[in-house]
Amino acid sequence: MLDALPAALRPHDAAAGLAIQAELPAVADDRAIGWKIAATSSAGQAHIGVGGPLPGRILAGFVHAPGATVPLAGNRMRVVEPEIAFRFAVDLPPQAAPRGVGEVLAAVASVHPAFEVPD
């Protein structure tokens, strides 16, 4: 999809891409309510041509209540992906050093089945 942008508008590295992504809630007039991680397997990374997992914000307008009908009009992929969703009891703000597994697990309040409808 980035190939569709003029070269001068494409992010030049991952940091620039994340900076652009940080502006998405304001541009979309929505609010970020969580995070997702894409391309968590080597096969998934190879499929989309990336070298590692990709973080992304989850916007409130794209979250649906249990039992909701999700329209696929305009959706290019027309697939549903099963996911595992975690609700956190506390925020884990960004930090320079990686967090330990124990610290992250201690912050998890609950685990839920979820579905993603990627586009």
Locations of regions flagged by a protein language model:
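Catalytic-core "active-site belt" of small-molecule-metabolizing enzymes
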Residues: 1-119
